[in-house]
């Protein structure tokens, strides 16, 4: 994938996030696409931190699914993982959080 295409997809994710996620949310690209060591078939990992008490199935429909659909426009797989900010803040010692903190790129919020 060219740098221009990569940047186009990053900007598309950022744009979609600005349309769909609520005020107070944070959107972070993480994984191989954020680190710059992705293969051609690598997916796009996106973390969405929501400022609410719990994640519901409606949140998945409202925030994860539109990003998955966006990926189809580019023949790419975009996987969004949802956390509440409270749950994220309480997972300080998790390897997942450490990886996102080290490699993640904030796209929105």
Predicted feature residues:
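Short beta-strand->loop micro-motif that forms the acidic, two-metal-ion catalytic signature
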Residues: 44-49
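Catalytic core of pol beta-like nucleotidyltransferases
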Residues: 1-28, 35-40, 51-109
